[in-house]
């Protein structure tokens, strides 16, 4: 579960390395899970890349440490909290996605992120 002021690692090559959640998008939502869109501030970034430190960006959560239950009865969790930076059209800013992503992204119409990911769990 991601909430305000949570830190996430960035799982793409947009230039940001760590982001901090400012707001979970939705009507009066407190927590974000896999597939939810958040507004975040870039806290650590690589030089001469697409995003800079202190930029405000939108990102979609692709991995969480919190255990997630699926409708089939399986439960899944990851080793870190990670997000992919997106633009207003829900397309990723980077051209690569690092690490596994959850299958729930396909159901939320983030098919471009799923196709770039090396592994879908």
Curated annotation (Swiss-Prot):
GO biological process entries: translation
UniProtKB keywords: Ribonucleoprotein, Ribosomal protein, RNA-binding, rRNA-binding
CDD domains: Ribosomal_uL14
Gene3D superfamilies the UniProt entry points to: Ribosomal protein L14
One CC-aspect GO term: cytosolic large ribosomal subunit
Molecular function (Gene Ontology), one example: large ribosomal subunit rRNA binding
Source species, domain of life: Bacteria
InterPro entries from the UniProt entry: Ribosomal_uL14 (IPR000218), Ribosomal_uL14_bac-type (IPR005745), Ribosomal_uL14_sf (IPR036853)
Entries under NCBIfam families matching the protein: rplN_bact
Protein role: Binds to 23S rRNA. Forms part of two intersubunit bridges in the 70S ribosome.
Entry's family note: Belongs to the universal ribosomal protein uL14 family.
UniProt subunit comment: Part of the 50S ribosomal subunit. Forms a cluster with proteins L3 and L19. In the 70S ribosome, L14 and L19 interact and together make contacts with the 16S rRNA in bridges B5 and B8.
Official protein name in the record: Large ribosomal subunit protein uL14
Gene, per the UniProt record: rplN
């Amino acid at each position: 579960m991601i909430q305000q002021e949570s830190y996430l690692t960035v799982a793409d090559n947009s230039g940001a390395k760590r982001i901090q959640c400012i707001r979970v998008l939705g009507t009066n939502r407190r927590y974000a899970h896999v597939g939810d869109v958040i507004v975040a501030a870039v806290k650590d970034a690589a030089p001469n890349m697409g995003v800079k430190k202190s930029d405000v960006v939108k990102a979609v959560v692709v991995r969480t440490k919190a255990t997630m239950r699926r409708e089939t009865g399986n439960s899944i969790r990851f080793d870190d909290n990670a997000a992919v930076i997106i633009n207003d059209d829900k397309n990723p800013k980077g051209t690569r996605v690092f690490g596994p992503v959850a299958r729930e992204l396909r159901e939320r119409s983030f098919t471009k992120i799923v196709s770039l990911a090396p592994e879908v769990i």
